[in-house]
Amino acid sequence: MLKKKPVSFSCIDGHIYKIFPNDLNANNTVFGGLLMSLLDRLALVVAERHTESVCVTAFVDALRFYAPAYMGENLICKAAVNRTWRTSLEVGVKVWAENIYKQERRHITSAYFTFVAVNEDNQPIPVHQIVPETPEEKRRYNEADRRRQARLELK
């Protein structure tokens, strides 16, 4: 039976990833591919918590790198369901780099991931509805639908 769930049911807020030397590229900044993988994994956890089923990544929208992150910094991550449709949902992910020695935090990357919930035969299945409660959640809910409409127009 499909349910209505609040954003808080499945969100991740404050996940921390410590940057070590093996996370760096040739410029001694965090490797972009590592960030992309981290974002996809966090978004997947949120999607599967919400749907209570296996989900597959269908689309990545607006993935942007705003600033570099460096060795020794912490990556602070937030991910939440923005909107659900019949068999899919959008999860927004945002990451900040934290330098605890300088007492600074800066936004380094964000993205929107669309997932499709699937059954054991890899066929799409209906997902639970999301219930936005706060003004911020309602804003993200509406913006997610605009992004989806823009994607559908590109087809």
UniProtKB/Swiss-Prot annotation:
Annotated keywords: Hydrolase
Protein name: Uncharacterized acyl-CoA thioester hydrolase CPn_0654/CP_0093/CPj0654/CpB0680
MF (Gene Ontology): long-chain fatty acyl-CoA hydrolase activity
Keyword Hydrolase: yes
Record-annotated HotDog ACOT-type domain positions: 9-121
Record-linked InterPro entries: Cytosol_ACT, HOTDOG_ACOT, HotDog_dom_sf, Thioestr_dom
Gene Ontology cellular component terms for the protein in this record: cytosol
Name of one Pfam family that matches: 4HBT
EC number: 3.1.2.-
Family classification: Belongs to the acyl coenzyme A hydrolase family.
GO annotation terms (biological process): acyl-CoA metabolic process
